Design a protein with these regions (language model features):
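Nucleic-acid-interacting cores, centered on viral/eukaryotic replication and modification enzymes
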Residues: 1-352
């Protein structure tokens, strides 16, 4: 899921999210393209090779030639199944979308309806093939377990699922929900080894470390997979009694929100999570910043490009003294696509 691991010239491809704002019928075309699964990870990876072909195109030439090259490259490299009718449709749509003709369509008055239309995912693409930011905005968590299942027709945007919030608030931290499947293991990318803690369903212990997980499970006579992760890392997950555990794609920490102003920069108020967070930052050599972005196991780590993108999103929301979980999540729930569109433009070109 290294969606943001793209070269800088590919940034404009993200602008498809704002296309329906002013181009009328193009909105249906974009939705259709998404529905057909045109924007899969392999396709965007294939776009890296287009610079060579762009240089060879004469002025005013149709984009179909390079789009065809991208699809053929994608098919060759990633083994995509060729469907002639669908490929022809994608050629037509992509020649329009990636021609640069509509890249200025994102405007300040873009409505949540327009944004929802751009990301309405009635498609055959799997959850894992979608960009993490897009998936969390569109409520990738709907109260049920995800098993890489296809998006369904009733996912219409930010406020279409009653009772479901894009984020969960805890300790002034915004956590973007991905799914609620239970697994006892943490990926070393997002938490230093030895800091994981598990909750034993047999004896009720909440401080079982990763090093003691196997022996503890043996002592209690249960499978090690029965251990549930318990408030591990800097609020990447949290256990609510009587409710399924929830896991998150990434956590955004606002060091300047009211609950953090009396603590060290980029640390949380909770002593336990502060200690873990400091160790995480030191181990990953993350530079101090107002917003700290931590990846969860579902992402397998966050590249610097991804980190800059999310920080750009948070900064565009003008979160001065407001709690990030209140302000940023409210912006997402209200479908303020302008914030995201502005953050997307040039996000990967920002200096490290």
């Amino acid at each position: 899921m290294q969606w943001f691991d793209m070269c800088e010239d590919d940034v404009d491809a993200w602008d498809f999210m704002g296309l329906p704002a002013r181009v009328g019928g193009c909105g249906a075309a974009v939705t259709s393209a998404i529905r057909d699964g045109a924007y899969v990870a392999s396709k965007f990876k294939a776009l890296r090779s287009l610079d060579h072909h762009k240089a060879q195109l004469p002025p005013g030439a149709c984009m179909k030639q390079e789009t065809a090259t991208a699809i053929l490259h994608s098919k060759k490299r990633f083994g995509m199944e060729q469907r002639s009718a669908r490929c022809a449709r994608r050629l037509e749509l992509n020649s329009m979308i990636f021609s640069g003709k509509f890249l200025r369509a994102v405007t300040k008055d873009m409505t949540s309806e327009a944004f929802a239309a751009a990301v309405r995912l009635r498609c055959g693409a799997k959850v894992a093939t979608l960009p993490p930011m897009l998936s969390c905005i569109c409520h990738s968590y709907n109260g049920r377990e995800w098993e890489q299942r296809e998006w369904v027709d009733h996912v219409h945007g930010l406020a279409s699922l009653p009772g479901v919030n894009a984020t969960t608030r805890h300790d002034g931290v915004t956590k973007f929900v991905f799914h609620d499947t239970v697994s006892p293991f943490c990926d070393a990318f997002w938490e230093p080894e030895g800091l994981q803690q598990f909750r034993c369903t047999e004896c009720g212990a909440r401080d079982v470390t990763s090093a003691d997980a196997v022996s503890h499970a043996t002592t209690c006579g249960i499978d090690v997979k029965a251990l549930k992760r318990n408030r591990s890392g800097p609020d990447n997950e949290i256990w609510w009694e009587g409710v399924n555990q929830q896991y998150y794609d990434f956590t955004v920490i606002n060091a300047l929100c009211p609950s953090h102003v009396n603590s060290a920069l980029d640390t949380l108020v909770s002593a336990v999570t502060r200690t873990k967070h400091v160790k995480y930052v030191e181990s990953k050599k993350i530079p101090p910043n107002r917003f700290t972005v931590l990846a969860c196991f579902t992402l397998g780590g966050v590249t610097e490009a991804t980190r800059r993108f999310i920080v750009k999103c948070a900064g565009a929301a003008k979160l001065e003294d407001n709690d990030l979980a209140e302000s940023f999540s409210v912006q997402l729930q209200h479908g303020n696509a302008r914030i995201l569109a502005q953050a997307l433009r040039g996000a990967l070109r920002a200096p490290a």
